[in-house]
Amino acid sequence: MLSADIKTVNISPDEIKKYDQIVDIRTPSEWQETGIITGAKTITFDPSDKSAFLDELSKAVDIKKPIALVCRSGRRSTAAAAAIDNSVLKIINLDGGMSSLIEQGYKTTPYKK
């Protein structure tokens, strides 16, 4: 079985532009509160139900291409990256999360259900 290449990068407005596939793993209330990265897929990561997360992920993105994960601060995306280690070939953990990105002036897109 192949193991994923997991890379952690500091999140910044410029860094965001590098990724075609971004998955925001926060909760709907968090998406509603702050907005999301333009073009990001929204899939909540629940550590108690990793298989459901993987199912949703494989439907939303091409798991053979790099996937950038973002949460509020970087902790959940680290856990999610570890959970999907064998399912995706390249994972980028956006460290600092949405909190850091917003502090740096990134203008989010309002979340719509």
List PLM regions with ranges.
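Structural scaffold elements adjacent to functional motifs in cytosolic proteins
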Residues: 22-24
